[in-house]
């Protein structure tokens, strides 16, 4: 697929929900609320997506971030509470990281094929180019943005102000 398609998916064009629209108008109390049947709140999912986007973008920049021993490390601790200030910070970080990823998606074809150093044995089993890492990032975010859309529906907060299908 093209870098245009990658950018469109990062920014929620076409049939894909806009990740920022799914969180930007949600108040902190709803972002912090746990929905029955879901192990994490919306705020926790945004924290988790931020964690992995930051991790991948740092790898792309040539840093060697430590890979967590367990996925639980990519979620906030149980004692983490989300107030309005923390929620605003999480949303700003989310927007900034999405913007950084979208800027990278517009790199030259040669740059998109640049190999990224592995920081974990699992990376050696996957394609390790900038393009491949960005596609993994989009797919990961898509999964969690879908969860957020479902949770918002269950909380009676769908569609978001920025728009979203409501079949």
Describe each PLM feature range.
Residues 2-10, 84-91:
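Active-site rim elements
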Residues 7-16, 20-23, 29-76, 118-167:
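Short, contiguous alpha-helical
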Residues 77-117, 131-139:
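Acidic/histidine-rich alpha-helical segments that form the ligand environment
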